[in-house]
Amino acid sequence: MICKNTFVDYPTTQVRKERVHTYRTLTSATPSLEFFSNENTNRLSEVQCKLTHFLSSSENSSSVRNTRTHKFKQLLHYIFFSNRSSSVLGKQNVHNSQTLGSVSFCEKHAIDINYSENVNKQLNFESHLDDQTCSKRFYFNEQSGSDRYSLKCDSDTDSSTYFGDSASETCSSASNSLYKQTDLTSLCMFNQNKIQTDWSSIDPMDNDKIVCADFEKNFNILKELLNNTKDNGIDQQIVHKEHISHLEKIWKNINEESSEDPSLLLLRLEFLLTDLQTAIRKYSDTVSTNSVNEAFFDKIKIELQAFGVLV
């Protein structure tokens, strides 16, 4: 069953108008879902319906439920209408997350990563980032004559980190083993101890094991991406050590929260979205989209099962 009316009823008319305008803009700019078949589109709609029901039945205030539901819909909306043209990506500033370290695809070849400099700030996902939030923009720069590209930081310091050819690895591994799809670890050329989670060996009903494995994997990946890259011949840092320390505190706080918290699901879906978008952006004309999509949906299934949502 496809959910036809799942939008949150916003408190003001102005917000509703803005949402409708954004939706119509993206829909008109993307007449066809070039990377998703009708079957996969229907499956994603069903996931949206089930998670919407799950969020709406949680024991939180209506404002918290609406905020979390809206954020998840923004993620799904981006997946639905993810066209690779720069004009569409320029308009798709809909992934404006509350969470620290969130990823936002605002324009072609650019990622915004927001984080708070106030390390003493209470760590939770229900409060908005305050005025002490700073933002850095990272650009993908393809290296001519090379199979790797860099993530360039648009800031006062000219720092960058080099990544491997992860997109092709993602696509090829997806066709062979859905649950062993190469993730962000393949991006870290300087990471000698790659962290791999054997999804096929994890019981889908073992919620604790799934949650712990995913948290440990993603946190270590982030530490490698944010840490000093001297081993790769680069003396500068993308993010200072105090920000890494702040990230550690937040990750510890996440681990101590209940696995039923929808915010954790949203955070993990951001990693999946980043992984998929990396493959599509780098190889938009040559990727085997069917295998990538199948792997992506199966990984979403695992994530949802950890929260008691069966797909």
Swiss-Prot record:
GO cellular component: cytoplasm; cytosol; nucleus
Key words of the record: Cytoplasm, Nucleus, Sporulation
Signal sequence, renumbered to the chain: none
Predominant subcellular localization, coarse grouping: cytoplasm
UniProt-annotated location(s): Cytoplasm; Nucleus
Domain of life: Eukaryota
Gene Ontology process terms (BP): sporulation resulting in formation of a cellular spore
Keyword Metal-binding attributed: no
Function: Has a role in sporulation.
Record protein name field: Meiotically up-regulated gene 146 protein
Organism of this sequence: Schizosaccharomyces pombe (strain 972 / ATCC 24843) (Fission yeast)
